[in-house]
Amino acid sequence: MHVLSNPKHVTWLTQMGLDQIGEAYWQLGVPELVEHAIHNSEGVLSAEGALVCSTGKFTGRSPQDKFIVEDEKTRDTIWWGPVNNPFDSKQFDALYEKVTQFLQGKRVYIRDGYASALPEYKLNLRTVTTQSWTNLFVNNLFLRPIDKELTKFSPDFLILQVPEFQADPHVDGTKNANFTIINFTKRVILIGGTGFAGEIKKAVFTVLNYLLPQEHQVLPMHCSANVGTDGNTAIYFGLSGTGKTTLSADPNRKLIGDDEHGWCDKGIFNFEGGCYAKTINLAKESEPQIFDAIKFGTIVENMRFFAGTRTIDYKDSSITENVRCAYPLEYIPGALIPSIGSIPKHIFFLSCDAYGVLPPISQLDKDQAIHYFLSGYTAKIAGTEAGISAPKAVFSACFGAPFLPLHPTRYATMLADKLEKYEVTVWLVNTGWIGGGYGIGKRIDLNYTRAMVTAALSGELAKAGFEKDAIFNLSIPNACPEVPTHILNPSNTWNSVKEYELEAHKLMEAFASNFALYCD
């Protein structure tokens, strides 16, 4: 639809200071957006029909360039610090004006969508982008209104994303030329200087992480979720690379969502309408559902083709390790639509432990669950970042610190209340190393991890009984179907028990130092 044909749209554009734009396209269909992207030289089609695009200079988020406008609404509520940088409200107004002036005479793509599959918590989103592929990304990742809903659509938040606009840090108050700024009072997300579409997704997640606990007492969670044929829901918390998307894409269970959910008294619900999966080393044998979702309508970011073909080389990380694809949830066979589940029966905390000292799976009591939730532990390994030559413990509160506008203890308290109220079993799963740390041991077989998760869900682990780990005081199952018993206790897999204990105590000390941040 050409925007200038609709008086209602013209009125809105005028109110937002966008009335001087040039060509404007509202709610284009997927085929039209793909055509525009190819015509605009934004991307090309792969052999499977997916749209392969480059995000430009930025191939990931820039957390240090994310800001929240500090005003009366946010001054005493935001968890200010390295995660949430304050931005002056007057400087925001000036920068917004500069961005809208920059758009004069330029082509834009506008899309209405919403977050939250549960209607009572719906957040209507209107996104304005300068690139058609980014508009397709928004279509794939957020929930898609039907025609009847569009006629009455009124946005709760405006997202304005202009990669071509470069801020002047000395004048505009940013740290660099790129920025993501959230204004809760004016309900605007302003993004400039970066073409990485994931900034849009995570800015909306940050908004929900602020609004839902304060206005609705809903716990927002950085987790994936699925449900079994018996109706039992499970959720999987984890940082990037821990297996959150992989483990939730189970052919024997229906996928609710792969990344962002809310937990209310009715159950859990997906915030999104799509998935944003990593594709580095993707193989049909190990992740068939994700592999088959890469087809027409899907976006693939920063991937290369095999020479002389349009076949994607999933092993090519020459642009970035953070290669991803964005597709609608419906592209996963058997996905649960609408994506709403019951109160979870099981929670899995996924940690990629590169020290090789955490058990492959262990059961947590309520106090341990809150401890590990606040810790949000995983590990970086040598080679993943400049300057990392040995495993490094990484703690990200609630398994999602970069997206938490409120203090982590606010979310931890909400989780503790739910663990008290409902019968939920919490598990810690090590998807990392066994038999020694990185460089000595080996990464645990994905098939073993799947078998342990399946046994936890079916009750087989509980039937087998548990033994207490001597260092971490974790409850380790005595047996698990399809998994060698000797690997269940990590001390059994090391050549030297003494070396195991030394490394385990190092990790314990790192946990203690990090947890001290929340003890006051």
UniProtKB/Swiss-Prot annotation:
Binds 1 Mn(2+) ion per subunit. Keywords: ATP-binding, Cytoplasm, Decarboxylase, Gluconeogenesis, Lyase, Manganese, Metal-binding, Nucleotide-binding. It is found in: Cytoplasm. Its EC number is 4.1.1.49. SUPFAM superfamilies: PEP carboxykinase N-terminal domain, PEP carboxykinase-like. Mn(2+) binds at residues 202, 222, 259. It catalyses: oxaloacetate + ATP = phosphoenolpyruvate + ADP + CO2. Substrate binds at residues 61, 196, 202, 324. GO terms for molecular function: ATP binding; metal ion binding; phosphoenolpyruvate carboxykinase (ATP) activity. ATP binds at residues 202, 222, 238-246, 287, 324, 443-444, 449. GO terms for cellular component: cytosol. Its main location: cytoplasm. Pathway: Carbohydrate biosynthesis; gluconeogenesis. It holds the Pfam family PEPCK_ATP. GO terms for biological process: gluconeogenesis. It comes from the Bacteria. Its cofactor is Mn(2+). It is an enzyme of class 4 (lyase). Involved in the gluconeogenesis. Catalyzes the conversion of oxaloacetate (OAA) to phosphoenolpyruvate (PEP) through direct phosphoryl transfer between the nucleoside triphosphate and OAA. Belongs to the phosphoenolpyruvate carboxykinase (ATP) family. NCBIfam families: pckA (TIGR00224), PRK09344.1-2 (NF006820), PRK09344.1-3 (NF006821). This is Phosphoenolpyruvate carboxykinase (ATP).
